[in-house]
Amino acid sequence: MLFRSKYGVTVNAILPGWIATDTQPEHERLQGMKTPLGRSGKPEEIASAVAYLASPEAGYITGQSIVVDGGNSIIEERGW
């Protein structure tokens, strides 16, 4: 996608963690409770990250993977 960058196109990714929904299975809810924040994320929190990346304020951010997981990736890296 770098060839599109000259047109102002940015390409990023959101990597969500456990997200609470009406259909979230119990085992996923329990996994969310094990994150450093002690809960699953909210759909609105993912939407906020997407909205930011789509905003003019993020115009110089490209090629990034933004982790929105309540710190879960940190504890997984350390094997906690």
Feature-to-residue mapping (PLM):
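Conserved SDR Rossmann-fold cofactor-binding beta-strand/turn motif
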Residues: 10-20, 54, 67-69
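A glycine/serine/threonine-rich, flexible loop-to-helix segment
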Residues: 6, 13-35, 45, 75-80
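Short, small/polar-rich loop/turn modules that mediate ligand/substrate recognition or access, typified
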Residues: 5, 10, 61-63
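Conserved functional loop/turn residues at catalytic and ligand-binding sites
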Residues: 8, 22, 39, 56-57
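A conserved structural motif in NAD(P)-dependent oxidoreductases
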Residues: 35-46, 57
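Short C-terminal tail/terminal secondary-structure segment
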Residues: 62-80
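Short, small-residue-biased leader/transition segments that mark boundaries at the very start
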Residues: 1-2
